[in-house]
C-alpha cells in the first residue's frame, strides 16, 4: 500500500518549509502566487489529502501553546520568544494563542509553570528544561495526556518529549577549545563557566571543550568548571575567586549568556588584559567588549531561529502526528571583531525583541494575519 503523502513530502519535494506549504494550501497570506501554484501542483501529484488533525486545527477556535522559559539576564530568551511569535505569525492563522510562562532562576517556578500549562489545557508545550530530572514526572504526565512537549535550547532525555531544537553543543565547545588553544600558543591554563552541569546543553559543551583541548593542545591545563546557576552576583564572586586563585590563567570559555559579570570580575582583578576570552551569544554590552578587544570571539546560538523552529516542529507534530526530525540541531555562528558589524547588519535590531516580547512574558500572544512573513524557509534566514 502506498504511504499517505504528508506536508513533509510536499515541502521536501519543493525545498521549502512546511509552514510555507501550510500557508499555500490554506490560501493564507505570505506566499507568492507562483509558490502557491507549485505547492498545489505537487500536492495533487503526490495525492495529498489533509488529515483529520489538520482539519481540527484549522477549525479550532482556540489553539493554545504554552511557552515555558527563563526570564533571562540578556536578550537571549527574548529572542527565543520572539522567534516563537514569528513562527506563529508565519502560519497566517488567527486562532493560535501563545501563553508565555517565565521563571526567574534555574528550577525556580519551573514545575509550577508546567503544571499551569497542563491546567490551562494547552495543546502543546515548548520548554526550556533547566532541571530535567525534576521535570521527568511532569513530562510523563503530559505524554499520558497527549500534550506534546518540544524542548528548546537544551534537551531532557528519557522524558517522553517529542523533539528538541538546540544549537550544536559539541561543535560549540570544540570550536572554543581549538581557538583558545591557538590564541594561547597551545600552552597555559584554561577555565570555563556555565550555569549548571545538570543542564544537558552545558554539560555537553564542557565535555567537548575538555576533550578537544586535550586532543589538540595537550600541554594546556583545564580547571574545574565554574557553575554560576545563571545568577550574575554568583558569577562575579566565583570568577573573582578563580582569578585570585589562578593568576596564571590564560584562556576562558563562557558557555552561557552570563558573560558580563565574568568580564567585570576579570577587569576588577586586573586579569582582563592577559585573558583570551570566548563568550556565548550576542547583545549590546558584549558587542562593546568585542569592539574593545576584551573578548576575542563569541559563539552565537541563533536564539531566534531556535524559537521559530521549535514552534514549527510542535505545530507540525500536532498536524501530522509525528516529528519529522526529533532532534533539530543548528550550526553555531562565530562572531569576532572583524565580522561584528556585518553580522549586526544582518541581524534583527538587538533591542527590538526586548520591547516586542518582554510584555508577553507570563502573558499571551495571539493572531497572525497581516504580520505573516514571506514564503522563504525560516532556516534560510541569517539567524
Predicted regions and their residues:
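N-terminal helix-turn-helix DNA-binding module of bacterial transcription factors
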Residues: 1-56
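Flexible loop/hinge segments that line or gate small-molecule binding clefts
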Residues: 131-171, 283-291
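Amphipathic helical "hinge" segments at domain boundaries
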Residues: 50-112
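An alpha-beta-alpha
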Residues: 84, 176-216, 224, 314, ...
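Hinge/beta->alpha junction and helix N-cap segments in small-molecule ligand-binding domains
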Residues: 70-79, 99-110, 131, 154, ...
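Hinge/cleft segment of the Venus flytrap/periplasmic-binding protein
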Residues: 213, 302-383
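Hydrophobic alpha-helical
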Residues: 125-143, 209, 227-286
